[in-house]
């Protein structure tokens, strides 16, 4: 066993003495050690129940013949961090989590690991750490939250409240109505109920092969979820005894292709591009944005979930879950690598046998796809020489191609103030810059400004571009991850108010209408602009972060 490195032989008597101090017995020491990598905290609704999840899993691990050893990692609630300086720490926390997993696994010898994440950066951070250490690892998320419900029966989620803020500011609803939405949108434990970043990544963990079927859609509070957690615990002990499969056996180029294919089919969050690129890097897989575009062009979008439709994860579950989406896309010859291995010990194709669509209003058959290409698109042009990302599944049909004058804001906070003050009009292109990985630093999400645009009724009349990123709850003509970012000399940093910006999502282009001579003149006068930051951690992140086209990961030292 891998754990013999810290528990076998007379030389390890001191080590065993310390383990006995934690309550371990001779029997415990004789069994495989199963790391329970938990992200429980009382801050995030998606994580508030994970202490109970871990307790259930540990009990099942013991029954299966393993010795569970739990440790915890930090986690940021993007919703609570939204709209203020706390959001600068969100993406950076992914690297912190990956480093923490690596630290705990490297310092202590485990035979296998069960990861219990749920929300945005915690999922990819744990995957990245698992890939570095490459011991048998299985993921089981905390599960999605049920959708809320308004007094009139309207289905709600967190985004409903963000958009209600703008409606309240505009005088369209009163304070009592806003308070009612606030109290009803998030009814209990679980990751926010739409196809936002957390649920997108939990679905993709299943597709990549690191989690058992059901990981993405079984509701957090359901009895089925409890059985799923138990099943995961039993499988982890089997993997420990077999010493496999290992994360790097599973996360291959084929698995990353599969992830992006299903991402396109289900209209996942634009953040999945950042995170899956980062995961590929840790797996030693070279992967570029053009490959993602190629997958998008050949993959139909067959499922739209909030914020792109009225449906939520509970509806996806009712319709057959992620397995039904995989099964339907597998009808396209060559669309998926069905022989890719998963933690179940079966191939991806074997795990979805017989998993048809149960509700075709939620998951469409291929013949009735929302579009013939995928829910995400990568744009290129003079404004995005290294790429930009748009969640096209959430863009109004009138906004698939657009041309308009730039209204420039130097930060998210400035943009929020300007939008609420009425500085943005129909036909404008909002530009929010200096919010990239380096410029922010931290690449803030832009849910507040995009929600304010929607709340003012401008969602089909205004576009927004940024070197920052968006919440998975964002919808509308919102183009993010512009690379190179302003802080590294990207053209977005040279724009002026009134410059004409045009994009075409079908053609995958994003440009500003300036001559090469004018661009050269502006560049000659350009000086890098960085938002000031007092945080030691964010200062280090700024120094080491790559841009979004490379996953905003930290550069490694030699």
From Swiss-Prot:
Swiss-Prot/TrEMBL cofactor(s): [2Fe-2S] cluster; Mg(2+)
Keyword set, alphabetical order: 2Fe-2S, Amino-acid biosynthesis, Branched-chain amino acid biosynthesis, Iron, Iron-sulfur, Lyase, Magnesium, Metal-binding
CC cofactor note: Binds 1 [2Fe-2S] cluster per subunit. This cluster acts as a Lewis acid cofactor.
Binding site for Mg(2+): 78, 120-121, 445
Catalytic activity: (2R)-2,3-dihydroxy-3-methylbutanoate = 3-methyl-2-oxobutanoate + H2O; (2R,3R)-2,3-dihydroxy-3-methylpentanoate = (S)-3-methyl-2-oxopentanoate + H2O
Enzyme Commission number(s) from the entry: 4.2.1.9
GO MF annotation, one: magnesium ion binding
Annotated pathway: Amino-acid biosynthesis; L-isoleucine biosynthesis; L-isoleucine from 2-oxobutanoate: step 3/4; Amino-acid biosynthesis; L-valine biosynthesis; L-valine from pyruvate: step 3/4
Active site as annotated: 471 (proton acceptor)
Domain of life: Bacteria
Positions of modified residues (N6-carboxylysine): 121
Positions contributing to [2Fe-2S] cluster binding: 119, 192
GO CC terms in record: cytosol
UniProt xrefs under InterPro entries: Dihydro-acid_dehy_C, DihydroxyA_deHydtase, DiOHA_6PGluconate_deHydtase_CS, ILV_EDD_C, ILV_EDD_N, IlvD/EDD_N
GO biological process: isoleucine biosynthetic process; L-valine biosynthetic process
PROSITE patterns: ILVD_EDD_1, ILVD_EDD_2
NCBIfam families referenced in this protein's UniProt entry, alphabetically: ilvD, PRK00911.1
Known function: Functions in the biosynthesis of branched-chain amino acids. Catalyzes the dehydration of (2R,3R)-2,3-dihydroxy-3-methylpentanoate (2,3-dihydroxy-3-methylvalerate) into 2-oxo-3-methylpentanoate (2-oxo-3-methylvalerate) and of (2R)-2,3-dihydroxy-3-methylbutanoate (2,3-dihydroxyisovalerate) into 2-oxo-3-methylbutanoate (2-oxoisovalerate), the penultimate precursor to L-isoleucine and L-valine, respectively.
Family: Belongs to the IlvD/Edd family.
Subunit: Homodimer.
Listed name of the protein: Dihydroxy-acid dehydratase
Lineage: Bacteria, Pseudomonadati, Verrucomicrobiota, Verrucomicrobiia, Verrucomicrobiales
Gene name of the record: ilvD
């Amino acid at each position: 066993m891998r754990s013999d490195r810290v528990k076998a032989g007379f030389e390890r008597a001191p080590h065993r003495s310390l383990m006995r101090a934690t309550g371990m017995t001779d029997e415990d020491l004789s069994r495989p050690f199963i790391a329970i990598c938990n992200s429980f905290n009382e801050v995030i609704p998606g994580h508030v129940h994970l202490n109970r999840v871990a307790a259930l899993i540990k009990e099942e691990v013991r029954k299966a013949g393993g010795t569970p050893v739990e440790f915890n990692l930090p986690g940021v609630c993007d919703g609570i961090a939204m709209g203020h300086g706390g959001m600068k720490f969100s993406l950076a926390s992914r690297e912190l989590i990956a480093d923490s997993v690596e630290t705990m696994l490297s310092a202590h010898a485990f035979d296998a690991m069960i990861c219990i994440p749920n929300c945005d950066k915690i999922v990819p951070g744990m995957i990245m750490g698992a890939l570095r250490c490459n011991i048998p690892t299985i993921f089981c998320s905390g599960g999605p939250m049920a959708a809320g419900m308004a007094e009139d029966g309207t289905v709600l989620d967190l985004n409903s409240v963000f958009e209600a803020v703008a409606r309240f500011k505009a005088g369209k609803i009163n304070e009592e109505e806003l308070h009612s939405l606030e109290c009803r949108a998030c009814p209990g434990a679980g990751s926010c109920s739409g196809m936002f970043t957390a649920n997108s990544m939990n679905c993709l963990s299943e597709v990549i092969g690191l989690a058992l079927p059901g990981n993405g859609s079984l509701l957090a509070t359901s009895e089925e979820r409890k059985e799923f957690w138990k099943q995961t615990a039993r499988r982890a002990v089997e993997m420990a005894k077999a010493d496999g499969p290992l994360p790097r056996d599973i996360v291959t180029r084929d698995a990353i292709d599969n992830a992006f294919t299903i991402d396109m089919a289900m209209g996942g969050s634009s953040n999945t591009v950042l995170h899956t690129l980062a995961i590929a890097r840790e797996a030693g897989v070279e992967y570029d944005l053009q490959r993602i575009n190629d997958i998008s062009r050949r993959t139909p979008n067959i499922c739209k979930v909030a914020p792109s439709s009225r449906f939520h994860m509970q509806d996806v579950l009712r319709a057959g879950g992620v397995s039904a989406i995989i099964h339907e896309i597998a009808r396209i010859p060559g669309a998926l690598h069905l022989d890719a291995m998963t933690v179940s010990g079966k191939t991806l194709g074997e795990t979805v046998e017989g998993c048809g669509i149960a509700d075709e209003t939620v998951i469409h058959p291929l013949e009735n796809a929302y579009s013939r290409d995928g829910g995400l698109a990568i744009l290129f042009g003079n404004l995005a020489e290294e790429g930009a990302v748009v969640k096209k599944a959430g863009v109004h049909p009138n906004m698939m191609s657009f041309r308009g004058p730039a209204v420039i804001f130097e930060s998210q906070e400035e943009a929020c103030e300007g939008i609420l003050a009425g500085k943005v009009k129909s036909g404008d292109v909002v530009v929010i810059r200096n919010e990239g990985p380096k410029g922010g630093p931290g690449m803030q999400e832009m849910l507040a400004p995009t929600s304010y645009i929607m709340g003012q009724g401008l969602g089909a009349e205004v576009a927004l571009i940024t070197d920052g990123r968006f919440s998975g709850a964002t919808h509308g003509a919102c183009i993010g991850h512009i690379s190179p970012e302003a802080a590294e000399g990207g053209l977005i940093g040279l724009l002026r108010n009134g410059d004409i910006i045009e994009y075409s999502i079908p053609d995958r282009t994003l440009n500003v209408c300036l001559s090469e001579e004018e661009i050269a003149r502006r560049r000659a006068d350009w000086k890098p602009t960085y938002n000031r930051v007092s945080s030691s951690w964010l200062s280090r992140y700024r120094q080491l972060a790559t841009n979004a086209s490379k996953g905003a990961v930290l550069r490694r030292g030699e």
